[in-house]
Amino acid sequence: GYVVNFTQTLIVIFNVLFALISVFIYPSIHVLKLISGSLFLLQPLIFNRYVKKNYTIDWKVAPDNSLIKSRWNGVAINLAAFIHNSTDVTVLTFLANLKTVSIYSVYSLVSSGIKQVIDACLSGIAHTVGQAYAKKNWKELNQKLDIYEYIVFVLVFFLFTVTALLITPFVRLYTRGIVDTEYNQPLFGFLLVLSEALYLVKLPHLNLAYSANKFKEITVPAYIEATLNIVISVALVKKLGLIGVTIGTIVGMTYRMVFHVYYTSKIVPGRAQRIFYRKLFLFAVGAGAGFALCYKLLPLQNVTVGSWIVHAIFYCVVIGSILLAISVLFFQNEMKFFAKYIKR
């Protein structure tokens, strides 16, 4: 597992770094996509080389289909995920115009990049929760869920709060000199970041359901989320445009988050829903306070590369300090358990 996690993390980090360099040196969507595609092409090549070097595979062994008896439920889950990922662009393409799609795509490049970084950072944790569930060790499982939730909240609220402050200035830099449409869309940028954050905070509970082989039980909620997203987006896109489709995504993500927190409380003895919502409330208050403080004390108005970097450093220090204070005051057990986990 560490080879996969390490490779994925490096690819994502290099993708973000090279994308930033490309934006400042030669801002072209074609170059950006070429860099991204080239880096991700390396991933299967690295895995293939590692497997051939370290494992002997007998390709003549008869398949055991009982091992994938839940495959159609898995297909349904992935179909729902595909609908989630493509709804906004599809609705905008058919019911808005290509200029609006262009705005969405540029902002989405940033939010998706941050999401990939967080996914890569978390990829090595999910299997530990699955191991504890398989052993039916509820005390260990609750401890690991606590630390999993804590790490997710720290990463999501730190990175996405900073992103919410910087995404629109970044897009203004990226699209400087382009006058075909108005790329300065701060409210849309904020709501897009919020929707991605809501998608990520449920990951501990979603991955627990996957590990527990509960694909059938979570299929219907996945489709309800997709339906809410589509219906609300279609209803609001004509009047609100980008904001409308983002509201649809936020409503769908909120429903799915609430369901998975509830479902975890049903399959894990002693796992009260308030544990999650307490973390959500505290980190949301801290992130909100940090956002307001940064926005008021040091707003980024005259955007240059230098000012963007200076503000990014300032925002990281402020948001990081607030979240650290919240951790010290309210989550000492999680911090200690995480330190022990790292040492092991």
Each PLM stretch: what is its role?
Residues 111-149, 205-211:
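Helix-loop junctions and terminal segments of transmembrane helices
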Residues 68, 137-154, 158-166, 183-189, ...:
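Interfacial transmembrane-helix starts/ends
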Residues 29, 66-74, 92-112, 140, ...:
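Interfacial/gating helices of multi-pass transporter permease domains
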Residues 26-33, 45-86, 90, 124, ...:
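Interhelical loop/hinge segments that connect adjacent transmembrane helices in multipass membrane
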Residues 166-196, 303:
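Interfacial segments at transmembrane-helix termini and the short loops linking adjacent helices
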Residues 294-344:
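Membrane-proximal transmembrane or re-entrant/amphipathic helices at the cytosolic face
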Residues 16, 20, 24, 44-49, ...:
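Membrane-embedded alpha-helical segments of multi-pass transporters/permeases
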Residues 7-19, 32-48, 77, 81, ...:
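Short runs within selected transmembrane alpha-helices of multi-pass transporters and secretion channels
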